[in-house]
Amino acid sequence: MNYSNPTQLQAAILDWAGTVVDFGSFAPTQIFVEAFAEFDVQVSIEEARGPMGMGKWDHIRTLCDVPEIAERYRKVFGRTPTDDDVTAIYERFMPLQIEKIAVHSALIPGALDTLTGLRKEGLKIGSCSGYPKVVMDKVVELAAQNGYVADHVVATDETPNGRPWPAQALANVIALGIDDVAACVKVDDTVPGILEGRRAGMWTVALVCSGNALGLTWEGYRALSAEKLESERKRIHGMFAASRPHYLIDTINELPEVIADINRRLAKGEMPQAV
């Protein structure tokens, strides 16, 4: 048997918050702030956004390793946060997240039509998230009520390692029956999510305006002046640069043009690992 490059995409592996639902990725961010506040430790929205895309326990651990946050914790508890302390914050985070996830469950405007179009072109729709399964079950239920059902879902605690490891993306490849990782595109609004796709050997698309990096509501995004929007795009492109996404677009609504371009490149023999 001989190996031959795939000539077109077979699947899109999509993130959830900030990609398909929850424009601005507010659901997890606000809850991190509230969870730390219950331990009398102040964390700003901007700080909470920093590690977005990681599994939530890892996200909290990363926040606790920020020197300024560790010092605030030490002033309250007399020590810097241990893994047991991280787990205590995580165990408070979880019920808050489940309780309030519905507040930020709306589909990103235009996403459903975009994904319907991709399916008509024969693409399977996989998905993964930094949420654990107990939260994802609720997210999936709410999305279904709004008309979106992915072909497969992988939560962060359903694989040995979460992002930026490639396990969740690869679990989708296996479940969807895809025969080559180069026939997949990973779409995400965070650096860990792009690294996940890169390490899985996939094409990658970073979303600049709908997610964590811009951190605005749909209305706030639409209200930006042309000059401010361009300035923010440049800033966010810089944030993503080290993770080397193949494409950067504002929202998922621009994905069909990217899919068409990837298919052209695959047909010419290009592979994502070589770019």
From Swiss-Prot:
Catalytic reactions of this protein: phosphonoacetaldehyde + H2O = acetaldehyde + phosphate + H(+)
Keywords on record: Hydrolase, Magnesium, Metal-binding, Schiff base
Residue pairs linked by disulfide bridges in the UniProt entry: none
GO aspect biological process, one term: organic phosphonate catabolic process
Lipid metabolism found in the keyword field: no
Note on how the cofactor is bound: Binds 1 Mg(2+) ion per subunit.
InterPro entries documented for this protein: HAD-like_hydrolase_sf, HAD-like_sf, HAD-SF_hydro_IA, HAD_sf, PGP-like_dom2, Phosphonoacetald_hydro
Positions that bind Mg(2+): 15, 17, 189
GO molecular function: magnesium ion binding; phosphoglycolate phosphatase activity; phosphonoacetaldehyde hydrolase activity
Enzyme Commission number(s) of this protein: 3.11.1.1
GO cellular component: cytosol
Keyword Cell division: no
Active-site positions on this chain: 15, 56
Required cofactor names: Mg(2+)
Job of this protein: Involved in phosphonate degradation.
Family stated for the protein in its record: Belongs to the HAD-like hydrolase superfamily. PhnX family.
Quaternary structure note: Homodimer.
Protein name as annotated: Phosphonoacetaldehyde hydrolase
Record organism: Pseudomonas entomophila (strain L48)
Lineage: Bacteria, Pseudomonadati, Pseudomonadota, Gammaproteobacteria, Pseudomonadales
Gene assigned in the entry: phnX
